[in-house]
Amino acid sequence: MSKNSEFINLSFLLDHEKEMILGVLKRDEYLKKVEDKRIRKLKNELLEAKRRSGKTHQEANRVCVHCQKSLGLIFDRGAPCQACSLRVCSECRVTGLDGSWKCTVCAKVAQLRIISGEWFLEEKAKRFKQVNVLGTDVVRQSILRRSPGSEEIQNQEQAHQGADKSDTLSSVRQKATHDGPKRKGFLLSKFRSATRGEIKTPKAESGRSYSLDLDNQNLQSFKSVSGSDRGSTTSSDLTDQEAGRGAPKGSCSNGGIPVTQRSPAPSARSVTSISSREHGFENSMALATIESISEELTKSHRRNTSGTPSIAVSGTSLSSERSRSELDLSESFAEDLEDTSSIRSRSVPGALDKDLNSLEDTEDGVDLVSSRFSANTHSLASGLSTSSQAGSDRKRSYLHVPDADSDTTSLNSMMSVYSETGDYGNVKVTGEILLHISYCYKTGGLYIFVKNCRNLAIGDEKKQRTDAYVKSYLLPDKTRNNKRKTKIRTGTNPEFNETLKYTISHTQLETRTLQLSVWHYDRFGRNSFLGEVEIAFDSWNFENPCDEWFVLQPKVELAPDISLQYKGELTIVLRYIPPEENLIFPVEQPQGKKIFKKGKKKESPAISGGILEVFIKEAKNLTAVKAGGTSDSFVKGYLLPDDNKATKHKTAVVKKSVNPQWNHVFIFSGLYPQDIQNACLELTIWDKEAFSSNIFLGGVRLNSGSGISHGKAVDWMDSRGEEQRLWQKMADNPGTSVEGVLMLRSSMAKCRL
């Protein structure tokens, strides 16, 4: 939609009419959340049913593919499903109104398609262009938008209240009206001088305290006043106002309202909380500025839909020379192992389930040392953590995040690998942490404002010293790209006043759990664990954010069950061409890799063996990792046990979409019929990052599921359910294309049976 058509003229409505409409929109938003939870529950049930299917071709199809019940020869023989043609018993059937029946899995798929409205969205996409703005959002924005006339009236009223405030607001509006074109050049020059360390952060005038509720009306009115001055407000402008806000237990904040305490309730890993909330957000002025900047960046990065899809083919002779930005982070940690899963197994997060011992403590120490060094030298250090205290220096990183985030967020360290695997120390956990959690629905920004801690344990008993910092993850993702950290603060009652930001859609956020842990930094030894708190967002109320105390809990070691985490779906088409039907010519070298020599041209050798064609069609509901709720995704494929880079296949990168369509063909040659039972097709989906390592989004493995390849036990022959069924169906029908929709794994570690 164009910028002009995003608002409707609703100035004729009265105030109470606007409130009634906003109330209806609020109820509509609540019902959408309830519906999203129900759809997510159905998806998890469907995923669990497919995982539970097990082996589908045992004893010549004489078992039910879903419940594994043995079928008889005469009685209780079972029948093939009319949708998927798999033989199921009488108990695994669902009868429709017209008398026809489907298996339980196909019935759940059809039910999910109807309830989620996927069929309607597909038909809508065929008839209309892609529309990113909902009608309810347009109405809400139109109501909350201030007209120029109302602004002038308010200016006159405020002029009688105080000369200082009216002068400030009028100057801001004057800049918004006349100096708009000059603002871009001013910000550019300010950024250049900031990188040289020439700008000194101004302090707030006379310690004034600005309190602004994170309500939509106040937030939008703040945007209309300071719309052109976005980006020029630094996070340190509010620091003097925020000094002394971390009130201890029993004291008051936010103008006399007592800060309530959350006592965590038992949970699976550690304990989270129930409480009463207070209203008001002291730091929402800075967040409003961030939100307005992120809004502009989101609009400027919208993707134009392309026309008809094209099909690309990659052969087995693709060059192994890749740019460093395409290589995965874990390839730099490759070891000389004789196992067939050497490089390939470390290119996916299967290592999340392995013991990495003291790697976490080491990388935490390196990150924090580099952040201290960068504060003095203005260098582009690894971890970017910008405090809201006065006088703190800005540090920028080359990570792929919007520029607006650099003033208010703590980004992950570039030197991190994986977390939470080492020794946690033997410090007795005590104390509490004060947090303010808010979410911006427009930009998809989750803001965790870490204020302070109190009554922490002593980290170093010998020196009687505590150097604390806070680290956060959005579970179950504990990769380095999902980590945020604060700066180090000294004492058992440290003041942080830092904002940790995540960009994530609200639907995805409801499936995540925030883990905040406090650590003692030891420069010459191991970092010590001081406590943690976990906050589940499935029922969190973001409408009225407030300051809350959380009691720190000890570490609880539980192996997370990540096999049922929904990461999206991948649609592929497989076809195996046996050697006797192979009429495909040798695949040419890619352009740019040809070597021209004088003399007689040599003929390319013919392809021996069979051909495996893998048509990568599309993916749906991928995890959004970029600002605006999108991803730049591509698919990478191996035919194990051959994991050489020369045989690696890649699709093109589809930008700014969580439902990409690749229409790309992978061709693997030299595959004989007897090799099918020993081979494994591994497909992984990655988010392309320009200046850092690619981010894993999910993957699948297709094989016989025997656990053995060429007489050796391997961990990658672990297919179950739909993955195993599709591979076996391809082997049983050579020359025929078979299509399947596969649930993506959240980790490429060996599947637990």
UniProtKB/Swiss-Prot annotation:
Residues 7-123 form the RabBD domain. CDD domains: C2A_SLP-4_5, C2B_SLP_1-2-3-4, FYVE_Slp5. Residues 260-275, 305-316 have a biased composition (Polar residues). It is a peripheral membrane protein. SUPFAM superfamilies: C2 domain (Calcium/lipid-binding domain, CaLB) (SSF49562), FYVE/PHD zinc finger (SSF57903). Gene3D superfamilies: C2 domain (2.60.40.150), Zinc/RING finger domain, C3HC4 (zinc finger) (3.30.40.10). Signal peptide: none annotated. InterPro entries: C2_dom, C2_domain_sf, FYVE_2, Rab_BD, SLP-4/5_C2A, SYTL1-5_C2B, SYTL5_FYVE, Znf_FYVE_PHD. GO terms for molecular function: neurexin family protein binding; phospholipid binding; small GTPase binding; zinc ion binding. Residues 224-238 have a biased composition (Low complexity). A zinc finger (FYVE-type) spans 64-106. It is found in: Membrane. Its main location: membrane. The modification Phosphoserine is found at residue 147. May act as Rab effector protein and play a role in vesicle trafficking. Binds phospholipids. Binds RAB27A that has been activated by GTP-binding. This is Synaptotagmin-like protein 5. It comes from Rattus norvegicus (Rat).
